Amino acid sequence: MGRAGAAANGTPQNVQGITSYQQRITAQHPLPNQSECRKIYRYDGIYCESTYQNLQALRKEKSRDAARSRRGKENFEFYELAKLLPLPAAITSQLDKASIIRLTISYLKMRDFANQGDPPWNLRMEGPPPNTSVKGAQRRRSPSALAIEVFEAHLGSHILQSLDGFVFALNQEGKFLYISETVSIYLGLSQVELTGSSVFDYVHPGDHVEMAEQLGMKLPPGRGLLSQGTTEDAASSASSSSQSETPEPVETTSPSLLTTDNTLERSFFIRMKSTLTKRGVHIKSSGYKVIHITGRLRLRVPLSHGRTVPSQIMGLVVVAHALPPPTINEVRIDCHMFVTRVNMDLNIIYCENRISDYMDLTPVDIVGKRCYHFIHAEDVEGIRHSHLDLLNKGQCVTKYYRWMQKNGGYIWIQSSATIAINAKNANEKNIIWVNYLLSNPEYKDTPMDIAQLPHLPEKASESSETSDSESDSKDTSGITEDNENSKSDEKGNQSENSEDPEPDRKKSGSACDNDMNCNDDGHSSSNPDSRDSDDSFEHSDFEHPKAAEDGFGALGPMQIKVERYVESEADLRLQPCESLTSDSAKDSDSANEAGAQASSKHQKRKRRRKRQKGGSASRRRLSSASSPGLDAGLVEPPRLLSSPHSASVLKIKTEIAEPINFDNESSIWNYPPNREISRNESPYSMTKPPTSEHFPSPQGQGGSIGGGGALHVAIPDSVLTPPGADGTAGRKTQFSGTAPVPSDPLSPPLSASPRDKHPGGGAGSGGGGPGASNSLLYTGDLEALQRLQAGNVVLPLVHRVTGTLAATSTAAQRVYTTGTIRYAPAEVTLAMQGNLLPNAHAVNFVDVNSPGFGLDPKTPMEMLYHHVHRLNMSGPFGGAVSAASLTQMPGGNVFTTAEGLFSTLPFPVYSNGIHAAQTLERKED
């Protein structure tokens, strides 16, 4: 029963049955491991459930499915987020999650940077959605509007492609909020890699402090010192060392607050990592490129408008330009540029010849000088900072600066500098300084630097000196280099001593007289070589301002030189010339030698004329010299007596600063007197002021100091008769002296400058006393000029008589004579005391054919015409005419000869009549 029940229930009733039952169950459901089975003890027996492995597998499957689902959703969201980034799909599809998050954060910060900054960068493309209720036909836009929209959609990329660099924006922590994809062109780095990263990860450790300062931050203590203290070699490999750890900039006590005194503009140089650099190319750091950062700090929009609070800095927006590689063979040579090589102190050691194409400087002018010598004073500080950047980083680009010109003005220039090392000698370093011209010369001939001041007067005097040497090379053996050096020395000394001319004037008087006496004894008329050495301005003391005594003041860059034609070949010698002393009291000492030989007296006369020229003409060459005051009460018209032997053709030269072609083939020599003078057969220099003695017969003659750039007018001096010298005739001059009057009534007198002042000297034939100050009037322009010509003195171009002699007359002046009046323009004012001119005398007509007239019978007709054309007023030596007699002359000043060649031919002169002292004016021809 029990067996049957047991069998019917299927449960074993004994041990044997239980064992067989278990074996049968195991065969049907094999268990991999006994431990995986659980035995559950119950009151009715023991049984085994399904394996734990199956349950675990199901759980794992569900977990994997859930994780896969979550990852899919996450990836989908990241993918959707990446598509929102302003990046190409080819880039966003390959971004990892961290990059997507980093770029997203940077983009969000960038939008805040744009919208919250001052001024806000509102996107033009953003706006309310189009009004869909409006019909499509009404919403249709014009083709131009569509074109503008398409263009603006790609405007950013066009701008980036046009830039010779890349753009990036940093926040106040120094992280890249944005950087353009063009950074890969210049640094080889990826835009995705840099965006959201710290700028200090890519900046040279030596530039961390500067970068932090530009952002208004400071580095942790010791971090900047560590970077700055490294050597160049250590800094080159710092990216792989512990120093290259990204410094965490800490904000300052007032972190991003900018005072009103600070500027927002930024311009500096840093070195950034680059994968495009060649090994060994960069001098200061390998693996880095020098980047020029120019930008502006961006401020946050102030929240309170009622009060002024310091604005908070949000970051920095910059344009970065990678400097050209330091190898000079990779620099493109443009048309408006020139290259110089300088040493580490910016001392120029080489310059291209192309510099002369753009400015008035030559390589000779700048080689050996420092660049700072040619930089405008306001730009020196900027160049100094660029110099420091160059020494620290190896490359730099200067700001726009002004390069000073030689004769005034400047040119705007920008330079790119690179340190180059000699491959053969590593210790030999120099700088390749490439200059790019940005403008044409500005403010020409306007001195803006003290270095430009000496060149302006030298430019005017160089032309006259050059013409002097050219004339001497034709007429004489020439002027030595010592003479030229003495001229330049005198110019410098004169400019230095021009402020106090009186002491130097006294010195020059004694020194000149001593030299004159020495030359009288030591030189003979037969030694032209020895006289050549004296035919210059010998001492700088003679060049000091003395317009109050021996000239017309500062007379501009021109001078008149009077030459005499003679008839004898033996007279072709140059008389000794010296500078003119201003003290005529000492000149009168030589008047006691009236009975000396004619050659000796003529030498003295020429020396004094040279002094006259040296005293006044040299002052004209220096425009900086001011005209000293003049004691008008001591103005005296000088006169000189000469023998009839000296009657010859005067050659008056007007030197002009501007170069003029005066070749013999030039049309200007076709004028009759010039045509005669152009024959260099018998040149004779009358550049010395005449003495108080007789005119000697010319023994030694030579070429004048005058040059080719002069207007030559032949004036026979025998027709220039002297002014009367009675008791009321005129004032004493340095040329009057006490010499006896020669018997020849037609010996030409000398009327010196009306501004000459001499306390000593006797009267003329009329015996004027020392106190004689009676003034006579000129009858016109010609009379004044003739008397000055007769005195062989330098005379200015008379424009108008507008006032008394002013001590401050510094206007640029030109000079001319009656022969050059039709060529030289009137530009100066001759100020006479009380609008008076030197003494004049009534016309006393003479026979031009008489022996006393002093003319060679073979004189050309045109010479005689010009000779008589200037006669107009001079009377015999012995005749003394009062001032009242001038009123008897005809207003037209037409004259004829008494019995001569032109007895029936009237010749008008330049005068417009006689004017009273109150209304006398100079008329411009």
Curated annotation (Swiss-Prot):
Q: Which cysteines are joined by disulfide bonds?
A: none
Organism expressing this protein natively: Mus musculus
Q: What is the annotated localization of this protein? A: Nucleus
Gene name on record? Npas3
**PAC domain location:** 398-441
Q: Which GO terms describe its cellular component?
A: nucleus
Q: Where is this region: Disordered?
A: 119-138, 219-257, 457-555, 576-645, 664-774
- The segment annotated DNA-binding runs over 60-71
Q: Where is the composition biased (Basic and acidic residues)?
A: 484-493, 529-549
What name appears for this protein in its UniProt entry?
Answer: Neuronal PAS domain-containing protein 3
Where does the protein principally reside? nucleus
Q: Which SUPFAM superfamilies match?
A: HLH, helix-loop-helix DNA-binding domain, PYP-like sensor domain (PAS domain)
One GO molecular-function annotation for this sequence? protein heterodimerization activity
Quaternary structure, per UniProt, is:
Efficient DNA binding requires dimerization with another bHLH protein. Interacts with ARNT; forms a heterodimer that binds core DNA sequence 5'-[AG]CGTG-3' within the hypoxia response element (HRE) of target gene promoters.
Task: Locate the coiled-coil region(s) and give their ranges.
Answer: none
Question: Domain PAS: where?
Answer: 152-222, 324-394
Functional note: May play a broad role in neurogenesis. May control regulatory pathways relevant to schizophrenia and to psychotic illness.
